[in-house]
Regions:
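Short beta-strand->loop structural element characteristic of the AMP-binding/adenylate-forming
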Residues: 1-35, 55-57, 69-71, 108-110, ...
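Conserved AMP-binding A3 loop
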Residues: 5, 85-86, 94-121
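Conserved pre-ATP/AMP-binding loop-to-beta segment of ANL
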Residues: 54-57, 61-98, 104-105, 129-136
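Conserved AMP-binding/adenylation subdomain of ANL enzymes
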Residues: 117-136, 143-210
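Gly/Ser/Thr-rich phosphate-binding loop
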Residues: 159-161, 179, 188-192, 201-275, ...
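Conserved ATP-binding/catalytic segment of the ANL
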Residues: 289-354
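C-terminal boundary motif of the adenylate-forming
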Residues: 327-329, 333, 371-381
Length: 381
């Protein structure tokens, strides 16, 4: 049975519920689960049809019957469960993950068993440290996003690891909870977004307990979602060298919801901010000149077959050779040594043209300004 984790912000921050209504109307679910009736009751009343079953972990809904998660746990398994499991195959849809929808309505990305299983193996082959011992994660990343869901949760499940859910996140109000958790639980691999690493790097300068616990057994730091400024990278390395006498490997790559998510990794020791590396095993890249830049396109077992009930969007997403058009621009790290891989060169769509006819490449310009203004400038918007 396919499922879809939905961003809580669609039901708690939004007042018109436009994106949540779009998700519900697109998927037409037969069952809706919510953690708390009080927190999500208004959103459910506004978007979920009366004939759709609702299950709550706690609380109740005003004027509407809802089942309880506890009651589901007491369901007696029948042979139909085994039959349904054996009927699944590589092409079976396991979940839908919606894109971020920062500029348009989010798109429902089909995630098949083939996509997820293939990508977990691709990631493991690219980062073999993950298979050396069951990983221990301390993780805040949401499961409605491919980084937290497919990548982090999937790797934990594949390798028999342990995932501690971090109720903090990299905001001024909640970073304290993350730091408290990292003082208590020592991860073996640590995943975060650049803002998270920036806050942790700053805290480690003065927090001896954080340094000691976080660096006690971690084998890999990994960031994704945006570029990590080189000054933050350098600060982390300086702290690690002073505390334990060596650097923790910092890794990143490139991917998207449509590639389950990982398409490329830089796992060389000679890596800097902006590097994205080489394709994961089984992934074929196509480099195409678009408006004076080089777009990277994907084809492989981890690439989505398309968007659910969105034929036009699916057609537009692939070129005539079946490659997924990413909109990401890349360039060679070293044109004389292609084995070093690629560097990120911004988004095709974010570039714009001045009235003089000159193209402005926003992504690389941001990185150059941060480097030029270090350590006084940490980010540019």
């Amino acid at each position: 049975m396919p499922y879809c984790p939905v961003s809580p912000a669609y039901a708690t921050v939004s007042k018109d519920y436009d994106k949540l209504r779009h998700v519900i109307d697109t998927l037409t679910p037969g069952l809706v689960f919510a953690a708390d009736g009080a927190r999500y009751g208004k959103a459910i009343a506004a978007t979920v049809a009366a004939d759709v079953e609702v299950i709550l972990a706690q609380g109740a809904l005003e004027g509407r019957k809802a089942g309880t998660f506890q009651s589901l746990r007491h369901t007696t398994a029948t042979p139909a469960v085994d039959a349904a499991m054996h009927a699944t195959g590589p092409g079976t849809i396991v979940k839908f993950l919606f894109t971020s929808g920062s500029t348009k309505m989010p798109k429902p990305v089909i995630n098949t068993q083939r996509m997820w299983c293939a990508n977990l193996q691709q990631i493991t082959l690219s980062l073999p440290v993950l298979a050396e011992a069951p990983p221990v994660l301390v993780d805040w990343l949401p499961w409605n996003h491919t980084f937290g869901s497919n990548h982090n949760f999937g790797l934990t499940m594949m390798h028999g690891g342990t995932l501690y859910i971090d109720d903090g996140k990299p905001t001024a109000a909640l970073i304290g909870e993350t730091l408290r958790n990292l003082r208590e639980i020592a991860p073996t691999v640590y995943f975060n977004v650049p803002t998270g690493f920036e806050m942790i790097a700053e805290a480690m300068k003065t927090d001896a307990q954080l340094r000691a616990n976080l660096l006690s057994r971690v084998r890999l730091f990994f960031y994704s979602g945006a570029g990590l400024a080189q000054p933050v990278w350098d600060s982390l390395h300086a702290t690690q060298e002073a505390a334990i006498g060596e650097r923790i490997v910092m890794c990143t790559g490139l991917g998207m919801t449509e590639s389950a998510p990982s398409a490329m990794f830089c796992n060389s020791p000679d890596v800097r901010s902006g590097h994205i590396g080489a394709p994961v095993p089984g992934m074929v890249l196509k480099l195409v000149e678009v408006d004076g830049k080089t777009e990277v396109r994907y084809r492989g077992p981890n690439v989505t077959p398309g968007y659910w009930r969105s034929d036009a969007a699916t057609r537009d997403a692939f070129d005539d050779e079946g490659y997924l058009c990413t909109g990401d621009a890349v360039k060679w790290i070293d044109e004389n040594n292609i084995h070093r891989g690629l560097a990120f060169d911004g988004r095709i769509a974010e570039d714009f043209k001045l009235s003089t006819g000159t193209f402005v490449s926003v992504g690389p310009m941001r990185a150059k300004i941060i480097v030029a203004g270090a350590p006084y400038i940490q980010d540019v918007v």
